[in-house]
């Protein structure tokens, strides 16, 4: 099997062309390949497939390192766009793709930046999914070690966002797993820890569902900004600093799509026998 190793701000991926080669992965195979000592090593496996809808260009599948399939990965979407361009699978600048939960448009810019239309944030608890009687800007979540206020939103995958004073001292290692598996998120959740620098600048750490803390999480950056805007804490254009680098997030509020812009880096191509 041919593959490419790529990363978006340090969030690393193996990307596989499922258009020109036949590929099939069991959860066990994915876990073996994801092992950084005995396999290739990655946060997520991305598969490019032929479109399910003839009006679109591709179908986009995402698997976490634990073998579970998920519906969205923002950093992966940028790498997906870079991959299909580099491999000559398309020459379009605006690339339309479907995912498990909806469609996206990926725009390849001339400065190595990829702009992703992430669609509208989803706030209705049942659609996140999140257990709550109604939408609120803040929810109280109780864990074994701490009670927190969080915003909850779906960007095609579920996110909770907790505001902290300092992301360097935030208890991500202990609180992250407890939030990820919290009973009020029946499909588990990506837990974001957001430090607000000013209305146009935040710092963020994300404990990802099925992957643990990563260098960057694109959909997590989108979720954090969306929550911050809904809570009246942020403006419409926000720089998000993650440990792997920065993203620009734009959102004009309810009824509008959210946009993420950032880099996508090709590291190397390889071949492995499954």
Curated annotation (Swiss-Prot):
It catalyses: (2S,6S)-2,6-diaminopimelate = meso-2,6-diaminopimelate. Pathway: Amino-acid biosynthesis; L-lysine biosynthesis via DAP pathway; DL-2,6-diaminopimelate from LL-2,6-diaminopimelate: step 1/1. GO terms for biological process: lysine biosynthetic process via diaminopimelate. GO terms for cellular component: cytosol. Its EC number is 5.1.1.7. The active site is at residues 73, 217. The keyword Amino-acid biosynthesis applies. Substrate binds at residues 11, 44, 64, 74-75, 157, 190, 208-209, 218-219. Catalyzes the stereoinversion of LL-2,6-diaminopimelate (L,L-DAP) to meso-diaminopimelate (meso-DAP), a precursor of L-lysine and an essential component of the bacterial peptidoglycan. This is Diaminopimelate epimerase. It comes from Haemophilus influenzae (strain PittGG). The gene is dapF.
């Amino acid at each position: 099997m041919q593959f490419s190793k790529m990363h978006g701000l340090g969030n690393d991926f193996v990307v596989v062309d499922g258009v020109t080669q036949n590929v099939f992965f069991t959860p066990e195979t994915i876990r073996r390949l994801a092992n950084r000592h005995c396999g290739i090593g990655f946060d997520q496996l991305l598969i490019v497939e032929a479109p399910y809808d003839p009006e679109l260009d591709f179908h986009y599948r995402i698997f976490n390192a634990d073998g579970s399939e998920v519906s969205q990965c923002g950093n992966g979407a940028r790498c997906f766009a870079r991959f299909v361009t580099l491999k000559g699978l398309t020459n379009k600048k605006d690339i339309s793709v479907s995912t498990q939960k909806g469609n996206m448009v990926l725009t390849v810019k001339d400065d190595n930046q990829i702009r992703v239309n992430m669609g509208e944030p989803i706030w209705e608890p049942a659609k996140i999914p999140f257990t709550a009687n109604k939408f609120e800007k803040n929810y109280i979540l109780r864990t074994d070690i701490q009670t927190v206020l969080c915003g909850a939103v779906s960007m095609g995958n579920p996110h909770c966002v907790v505001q902290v004073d300092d992301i360097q001292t935030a208890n991500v290692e202990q609180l992250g797993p407890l939030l990820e598996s919290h009973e009020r998120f029946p499909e588990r959740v990506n837990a974001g820890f957001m430090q607000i620098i000013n209305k146009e600048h935040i710092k963020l750490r994300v404990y990802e569902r099925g992957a643990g803390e990563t260098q960057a999480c694109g959909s997590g950056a989108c979720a954090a900004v969306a929550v911050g805007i809904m809570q009246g804490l942020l403006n419409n254009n926000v720089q998000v600093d993650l440990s792997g680098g920065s993203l620009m997030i734009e959102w004009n509020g309810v009824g509008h799509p959210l946009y993420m812009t950032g880099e996508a880096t090709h590291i190397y191509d390889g071949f492995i026998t499954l």
